[in-house]
Amino acid sequence: MKIYVGNRKIEDGSYQQIPDPSILQHVADDAECTMIILDGVLRRYNLSQVAEIIKLCQKKLRLGGILKVVEVDFDLLVYVYQKLGNIVELNNAFMTNEVRSLLTLDLLLEMMKANAPDVANVNFSRVHNIEFDVEFVRK
């Protein structure tokens, strides 16, 4: 089973799309998923909730299954602000009430290590200017 958690339109029909990670508990059995994509959803939760989401994803992944996280990197966001000085755009991002935690790649890696010890980082890339895309595999 492949699960996409996020609000972007996806073309790949092999994924079941859900808007919220809490729904994962109801749509997949433990160790059923071969792929879970969390696309821009972690920032909607505080850090303790993010830790619980990570644990849930680990539980739902089968051995060799991949967890892919796409998220805004706060370090890059600050860098872009310092270079471009567009405080209006930065404020708009926080005014939507969609941001409850500020994640960086390093923080996510630390949280994965602490909350999902059976998952290892396997791939990392940048998506756009301020987002990271990182994949973890359950071992």
Residue ranges and their predicted role:
Residues M1-A28, I66-K139:
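Class I (Rossmann-like) S-adenosyl-L-methionine-dependent methyltransferase catalytic domain
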Residues L24-L38:
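A short acidic, Gly/Pro-enriched loop at the edge of an enzyme's catalytic core
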Residues T34-V41, V50-I53:
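A short beta-strand submotif of the Rossmann-like class I SAM-dependent methyltransferase core
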Residues R43-Y45:
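A short His-aromatic
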Residues L47-S48, V78:
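Short, function-defining helix-loop hinge/capping sites that tune catalysis or transport
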Residues A51-I66:
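A short glycine-rich, Lys/Arg-flanked "PGG" loop and its adjoining helix->strand segment in the class I
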